[in-house]
Structures are given as structure tokens and as C-alpha cells.
Amino acid sequence: MKKELFDLNLNKDIEAQKSDLNPQSASIVKTTIKASKKLCRGFTLTCGCHFTGKK
């Protein structure tokens, strides 16, 4: 539940940023967020995401 909620909030933030950024910058933001989500596994970071253990 928390993971889906985090993803929804993240998507809202991206949509809000799109209006301020040009498309290239928006894609860089998305790529950076994807990379940070991969690293955020098994522990909580300041980004607020929490995953339980590695598979």
C-alpha cells in the first residue's frame, strides 16, 4: 500500500514539474527518480520510499 501511494505522489510531482521544464529536462528528472528508486531497497532514504529486503 505504501509503495503504491509513494508512486502516485511521485507521478503527481512529475506532472507538476513537466509544465515548468522542457521535455528533455523532464526525462532527466524521470530517469534520476527511477535510478534512486532502484537504490532505495531494504532501507528508508530521505526520498521517503521504503522497500523490504532484496529479492
From Swiss-Prot:
Cross-link type Beta-methyllanthionine (Thr-Cys), residue numbers: 44-47, 46-49
Keyword tags: Antibiotic, Antimicrobial, Bacteriocin, D-amino acid, Lantibiotic, Thioether bond
Presence of keyword Membrane: no
Record flagged with keyword Signal: no
Protein name: Lantibiotic epilancin 15X
Propeptide span(s): 1-24
Organism of this sequence: Staphylococcus epidermidis
GO molecular function, one term: signaling receptor binding
2,3-didehydrobutyrine PTM sites in chain numbering: 31-32, 52
Modification sites for 2,3-didehydroalanine (Ser): 27
Gene: elxA
Biological process, per Gene Ontology: defense response to bacterium; killing of cells of another organism
